[in-house]
UniProtKB/Swiss-Prot annotation:
Principal EC category: transferase
Domain of life: Archaea
Keyword field: Acyltransferase, Isoprene biosynthesis, Transferase
Active site per the UniProt annotation: E80, C112, H234
EC id: 2.3.3.10
Complex and partners: Interacts with acetoacetyl-CoA thiolase that catalyzes the precedent step in the pathway and with a DUF35 protein. The acetoacetyl-CoA thiolase/HMG-CoA synthase complex channels the intermediate via a fused CoA-binding site, which allows for efficient coupling of the endergonic thiolase reaction with the exergonic HMGCS reaction.
GO terms classed as biological process: farnesyl diphosphate biosynthetic process, mevalonate pathway; isopentenyl diphosphate biosynthetic process, mevalonate pathway
UniProt protein name: Hydroxymethylglutaryl-CoA synthase
Gene Ontology molecular function, alphabetical: acetyl-CoA C-acetyltransferase activity; hydroxymethylglutaryl-CoA synthase activity
Record flagged with keyword Acyltransferase: yes
Species in which this protein is naturally found: Methanosphaera stadtmanae (strain ATCC 43021 / DSM 3091 / JCM 11832 / MCB-3)
């Protein structure tokens, strides 16, 4: 069965606390942390971007997959913060991991679900027999305007998945999607920061689509929340994540391992892939995982995944998320603003 052959993740080591941002804008940090269920977020260093995050994650995925990168037939990088408007991130990743030029590669965009869209595309190509392995990455160095609510959550990170049919560590048993034209969040070409619909981003956007894809998955597979060991969802903040998990009948024991936002913020295209990676870091053979992404604009992709025996053989070939986050450095707002290019000089 087609599934995950290897996975890898990367999160920058810099962090900024909610209190530090709130101090600059005169906001109440306790109210913000409680409302968003976010305490701090990751910050990309001056030498980090979507490309470097993608490369690190891809290399770790290869370490676990134990395959020749020359056998990868497709590379997709999903992000809304590609460094170049015209120059693919995917080709740079391909060169960095020493993949063959005999492949198809593309940068994907669908707000925060571009990474899972890449996984679906790779699954389709592998199942069709067109390629042996596909590499799908979801990564971002997300943006939030100074003083905007997004500034408390917009962060950086990503995860990579190698999809194939042989020696899988987890089978992707089913996938489905739910998509509509919903203008909840957008950024035009040339704009530094996105615009969003405030409360409109909740019920008619995030919840409608995540629940739409999730309920479709449960119906098509004939399963309920009780049939899964773990669940992970897109996490623009901790509040939405917990609410949608509970609406679907999942317990804290099922959803807490995939909830990373309180300590790293919203990694956008990396959010659901990173949450899934966190689950794979501890999952046992036979465990069943329910995963649903979300991207503004708007749509959700859902996956039913079952973990295989091989995961215990290769899990320690690369750093786990716990190890990646073991060494962090806190920065003040001035350093954060400098790293993120928020200070513009004429």
């Amino acid at each position: 069965m087609t599934g995950i052959v290897g996975y890898g993740a990367h999160i920058p080591s810099y962090r900024i606390k909610v209190e530090e941002i709130a101090k600059v804008w005169g906001d109440d940090p306790k109210s913000i942390s409680k409302g968003l269920v976010v305490n701090q977020k990751s910050v990309p260093g001056p030498d980090e971007d979507t490309i470097t995050i993608s490369v690190e994650a891809a290399r770790r995925a290869l370490q676990r997959a134990e395959i020749d990168p020359q056998d990868i037939g497709a590379i997709y990088v999903g992000s809304e913060s590609h460094p170049y408007a015209v120059k693919p991130t995917a080709t740079i990743v391909a060169d960095a991991i020493r993949a063959s030029p005999n492949l198809t590669a593309a940068d994907l965009e669908f707000a925060c679900k571009a990474g899972t869209a890449g996984i679906q595309a790779a699954v389709g190509l592998v199942k069709s027999g067109m390629i042996k392995y596909g590499l799908a990455i979801g990564a971002d160095t997300s943006q939030g305007a100074p003083g905007d609510a997004l500034e408390y959550t917009a962060s950086a990170g990503g995860a990579a998945y190698i999809i194939g049919e042989d020696n899988t560590i987890a089978d992707i048993e089913h996938t489905c999607s739910f998509t509509t034209d919903t203008p909840d969040f957008y950024r035009r070409e040339g704009q530094a920061y996105p615009s969003h619909g405030g409360r409109f981003t909740g019920q008619p956007a995030y919840f409608k689509h995540v629940l739409g894809a999730a309920n479709r998955m449960l119906e098509e597979t004939g399963t309920t929340a009780k049939d899964y060991d773990y669940a992970v969802f897109h996490q623009p903040n901790g509040k939405f994540y917990i609410r949608v998990a509970r609406k679907l009948g999942f317990t804290e024991d099922q959803y807490k391992q995939g909830l990373l936002t309180p300590n790293i913020g919203n990694t956008y295209s990396g959010a659901t892939p990173l949450g899934l990676a966190s689950i794979l870091d501890i999952a046992k053979p036979g465990d069943k995982i329910f995963a649903v992404s979300y991207g503004s604009g708007a749509g959700s992709d859902a996956f039913k995944i079952t973990v295989n025996d091989r995961i215990e053989e290769v899990r320690n070939n690369a750093k786990t998320l716990e190890e990646i986050q073991s060494k962090i450095t806190y920065v003040d707002y001035a350093t954060y603003a400098k790293f993120k290019g928020k200070i513009k000089m004429n």
